[in-house]
Amino acid sequence: MLDFLELEETVGRAWHRLIGKTGSWPQYPDHAVQLVDIRQRLAICFRGFGGDIAVQIAPARARTSTHRLGLRQRMALGEEKLAQPLRDEATLMLPPEIALFPDRQLNYDLYVWLVGYMAVMPMDADALPEDALRRDLAALQIAEQTVERACRAFPGLKPRYKRLCAAILAERPKRPLHRLEQQVEARILSLLKQGADLPDDALPTIFPHRGPAGYLPALPVPLWPGLMKREEVAPRTGEDEPVRNSQSEGAETGRQIAQRERQDPRHADRSPFILNRFEKILAMAEMVSVDRPSDDSDEQNAKSADELDDLTLGERKGRPAARFRFDLDLPPEAVDRSLLTAELTYPEWDYRKGAYLPDHCAVLAAPVQEKEKPLELDAAAQSLVRRVRRQFEILRPGREVLRAQLDGTDLDLDAVVRSRCDLAAGGQGSDRVHLMSRPQANDLAVTLLVDVSLSTDAWVDNRRVLDVEKEALLVLANGIAACGDRCSILTFTSRRRSWVRVETVKDFDESFGPTVEHRIAALKPGFYTRMGAAMRHATAKLAEQPNRKKLLLLLTDGKPNDVDHYEGRFALEDSRRAAGEVRAKGVNVFAVTVDREASAYLPALFGRGGYALVANLAKLPVAMPAIYRMLAG
């Protein structure tokens, strides 16, 4: 009753009511559609629309829009952030939530339209002009042409687009603009009316060659995604030092646009006696961490960095106090196309050129160093090993009996009777009257290829990923030994294309025993995951085996990546190509992953039915034998 006497609270509530909700577009939270709920469906739609299979869908980050603000917006923050849909060669960046219309179906239709639009968006378009006016007009021209192309290619989208245009016209804000800005806005409204099949009485406008001073871009239209062209950056030459397990790791955020830091040779040799003017130190609005070799930033910097429109990714020496997780969209690094000279080299697929890069990766093959003590298993794991061995012993081939043989340990009575009858009838008897038994041949050779990259050093549900992988590997290896299948175990990690290390835990002709168990216990985290080269090397060894059936079973915990150009779509396309090469050699390939987000990219790599996702890390030792039994038949 006396709340009005609290002046600060009263003024605060009044101010919040005045400018608390100043967004240009209305929001209807009760009818919102979340990207995370329909991402798989949209990915299928994108493939169906003819989109590239290795292109990923990621949430777009809200970025500052430079359109003209209303009075209340200027009184509030003085800026507006919009999660505008964007596309580059590797990613579709869609708003994490759409609540633009008071109709949930319309919000869902907008997602479907954006995916169809991006599927036919021209990726070879020229960069937009620097001038703001010319950039707006060029973007509108591209949007008009792309809409026409999408509606012509997919007639079923046209009624959807018509409804969306009508809804956008009803929701688009009307605000005072400068004369030239108003003319651009009229052009936007004309295109929307054209899409909604509404009459348009706007007259053609002749725009100047350049926008005048003070011209601000138009408010973006959610129906028309933008194209992000990223130029290649020079490859890095310095040694990479990945950070080992830190104290904390933040939660994942949306796709953050980032660029690599330009290398300044003066930073290589910095003297503490060189004076620096304070004016050179940048504010937090421009960068999170000042380039200093010893001090670490506070964890609050994660939140500050998350609010930036653009991040610059640099390399610093030393161990950070904390780790922050960002989903970065980096410009592609230029590919070093020089040939490598090594004992084992393999090609790599460059999807941009549509050709292989010969002798591009050097594989260093070596045995795993043994550990003095084997892996210690708890009572539950030991019980699982015994149970799996019993289950797999049933799969061990029995002995087959061959009838009507020239020699053997017993007589084939049917053959003897038949031979005597032939002689009694005046015919010629047969000497093939013996039985011979022999063990059935094992017709399967399998290679277990295990990812031991740095990410396996992470902890999930109070257990280290690599420790669980070791346990699962030990359980499965015991089972394979019990059923008698020929098996090899390889691990892989990488650090640039010149250092792809593949280590042998067990070879085909080696029996499973304490030595192999010690090697499994000795596995430790490496660096990065150059999956394509590792798969090609493992397949080359597997293809040499005489068995009729061959299986490459890959165990991994994340996307393929490396410290050089091998990341994003390049890595996905090369890994997908490598999987196709494996199958072309008559080898079945199957991937098992513990990455909970793997459903966004594994179907593109291994196809439908070519992978299994074990979301609960603790269940991996139980799941691996079951998966193997399914694959082994």
UniProtKB/Swiss-Prot annotation:
Record keywords: Virulence
Domain of life: Bacteria
SUPFAM superfamilies linked: vWA-like
Start and end residues of each stretch annotated as Disordered: 232-270, 290-314
PANTHER family per the UniProt record, alphabetical: NORD PROTEIN
Function: Part of the operon norEFCBQD encoding nitric oxide reductase. Essential virulence factor, probably involved in the detoxification of nitric oxide (NO) produced in the macrophages during the innate response against infection.
Name under which the protein is recorded: Protein NorD
